[in-house]
Amino acid sequence: MTTTPEHTSAVPLRVLDHNDIFRDEVYQKQFEGKREFENAAPKEEVQRVLDWTRGWEYREKNFAREALTVNPAKACQPLGAVLAALGFEGTMPLVHGSQGCVAYFRSHFARHFKEPVPAASTSMTEDAAVFGGINNLVEAMENITALYKPKHIAVSTTCMAEVIGEDLFAYIGAAREQEAITQDFPVSYAHTPCFVGSHITGYDVMLKGILEMLAKSPDADASKVAKSDKVRLNVIPGFDTYIGNHREYKRILELMGVDPLILGDHSSSLDSPADGEYDLYPGGTPLAEGALAKFSRASLVLQESTLRRTAEYIEKDWKQETVLLETPLGVKGTDAFLTAVAKVAEVEVPAELTAERGRLVDAITDSHAYVHGKRVAIAGDPDLVIALTRFVLELGMIPVHIVSTNADTTFKARMEKVLSASKFGEEATVWPEKDLWHLRSLVFTEPVDLLIGSMQLKYISREANVPLVRVGFPIFDRHHLHRFPIIGYTGGLHLLTQLVNTILDEMDRNDPDHSFELRRRSLIGAAL
């Protein structure tokens, strides 16, 4: 059977995906007919307006808006609460709200991690919005314990529940009274209104709620702490969607002779092996170990903006030493992390980690000819953006635009401190609470060589013809990046590899024939 290219979608047993099928002539004619029927603006007029939106006049209007947000680089609070819950053993996240919200959270994480994500909803509808959702919550808890048999339920809320003032503490008490759950069944909760804060706020308050519950449980008994020659340190990564980071924290501390307890460890729950057996609750911080966390020597809090409430709780209620650190990304960030661990635990930095540091420095030296002087724009969560900025400064790159939609009041001062420490930070402008439509104006009016951020930047990348290095959350359109660390010296090497190879790929695409070579050498290699 012979077919013409434009009709390949009609060939039996051959199904084209959306990338190809809508290029067929039949669909192209439909699109043109649709434009004509809708009396659409001429293509020339559309292009004129588009070009205008890329200029300085539109930028000024864009930055003058106050009552409109366009494409914010953030999600809502309960999404972060779900991730916090997934970091603990046998925990079922329960979101008090509509089914649609929970479907969004599950699909968002499933697309990023490529893993099934357990989460339940109280299925609030119009009736519950008017008369209250106590029956929904009680019934949900009864069904969850009967069907899914969790060890712990972590309850958060959506905007529907918050607008009508749902009282989680009272509702959970009612569930116990009505024997939907037993009197001693572990339930933590946090109020996570969607209309304030962001996913990092939700992560923080849910983690705090879980730790409060564990600290009051029967397992929170100092006599149950196992005897060990190793110092135990709590490590709190925060809203960190890099599975590889969690494993790297454990590896680093174990190399230093420290017993690490990751509080909120989703490295197994969101990266379980395909071994033929399905486990609804793989991994997570053991609840019994979490209950003993308040007896650790100290807590290392690795996201200052994200974990502010959790850090305050640990310091004030547990009376525990709380060490606030920037995310240990790059040479300086990892140096500070290892120095803090060595000081608190009274241990030495082993030779293996010193060698890893040397390899990262060597790799930076090898690649500096290609990364040095490149102008970059960075967008994402505040703690990650600060760490990324510090790393690109180490590489001799020039951060020009720094955007964080969900930045807190301390973000700008913290960022300016990082920028002022390097001559490469002199051109940078910090934009807290701005969205990706603002970033689009910035990139067109003050061009850059590279974008660094989540997949949400891909539209700017394509329109402005600027390559994107995907770092952060969410990343649906590339696979397995979250499985590798970006923290520590090893993670820094992974991130450097992404950066320099993206630049080299772009050079290959644009090189004239006389520069299109098989070997790309560093200056050191060329000299040798």
Swiss-Prot record:
Positions annotated to bind [8Fe-7S] cluster: C76, C101, C159, C194
Catalytic activity: N2 + 8 reduced [2Fe-2S]-[ferredoxin] + 16 ATP + 16 H2O = H2 + 8 oxidized [2Fe-2S]-[ferredoxin] + 2 NH4(+) + 16 ADP + 16 phosphate + 6 H(+)
A cellular component term, taken from the record's GO annotations: molybdenum-iron nitrogenase complex
InterPro entries in alphabetical order: ChlB/BchB/BchZ (IPR050152), Nase/OxRdtase_comp1 (IPR000510), Nase_comp1_CS (IPR000318), Nase_Mo-Fe_CF_bsu (IPR005976), Nase_Mo-Fe_CF_bsu_N (IPR024564)
GO BP annotation list: nitrogen fixation
Gene Ontology terms, MF aspect: ATP binding; iron-sulfur cluster binding; metal ion binding; nitrogenase activity
Enzyme class: oxidoreductase
Keywords noted in UniProt: ATP-binding, Iron, Iron-sulfur, Metal-binding, Nitrogen fixation, Nucleotide-binding, Oxidoreductase
Enzyme Commission (EC) number: 1.18.6.1
CDD domains hit by this protein: Nitrogenase_MoFe_beta (cd01974)
Pfam families cross-referenced by the UniProt entry: DUF3364, Oxidored_nitro
Domain of life of the source: Bacteria
Cited PANTHER family: LIGHT-INDEPENDENT PROTOCHLOROPHYLLIDE REDUCTASE SUBUNIT B
Subunit organization: Tetramer of two alpha and two beta chains. Forms complex with the iron protein (nitrogenase component 2).
Chain's role: This molybdenum-iron protein is part of the nitrogenase complex that catalyzes the key enzymatic reactions in nitrogen fixation.
Similarity remark: Belongs to the NifD/NifK/NifE/NifN family.
Miscellaneous section: Cys-194 is present instead of the usual Ser that serves as a ligand for the 8Fe-7S cluster in the oxidized state.
The protein, known as: Nitrogenase molybdenum-iron protein beta chain
Source organism per UniProt: Frankia alni
